[in-house]
Amino acid sequence: MGTMETAFDFNEKFGTPKKLLCKNFNKIQISVHPYFSGIYLCYQEAFKSLKTDLSTLNPSLELHVWKDPNFSGFTITNNFQWFLYWSQHIPKNINVLVHSFPQDEDKIELLKKVASSEFIKFLSFYHELDRLNPKKMQSLINAHISSEVILALNKENSFKPHRTMSLDLLAELLSCTQNQLNYRNKVINRKRQNVLDQLQQTS
């Protein structure tokens, strides 16, 4: 969860997790919690253009998971970058930190805000513009990331107090310009149009 302070705050809100040492990560049943599947889609899209090697961030050998009585096995709601990372780089041993999934609507909303903020931080890693689909990324963010988190971000960056992610704000997070993202969108549209044209010619 980052620093000790945020870990302490997190545990205060969501309870201290039980620690399980997992020696066979492949055998453990972890699925994305359905309430958080939209945020997971945002991560999957962002991973396509990720240039930063996550192993350089010295990932701690742990993963936060949640036990929800409505679902079998463990579910995951946040820190999806590490779930994706450990799924691709199977660890020999990993500590699985098991929280009880909140049954209270306000706590679930709070967890969505936490997961949304984590995703926004993840976007500030280095991404390869040539592998990014800005329009798709923007629409996924506006569909699934907490609008309150986006509103706070717009205010922080002196943009209009909107609850949606503009291309301008997305560019700011990705450390590039709006023009670069517009150009990338045009390139993608042109490629798509070329494919459609070819299909029409062959039909």
Range-by-range predicted roles:
Residues 1-97:
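Short, charged/polar connector segments at secondary-structure boundaries
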Residues 75, 160, 171:
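Short, flexible active-site loop motifs that bind/organize anionic cofactors or intermediates
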Residues 157-161, 179-202:
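Short, solvent-exposed alpha-helical "recognition" segments
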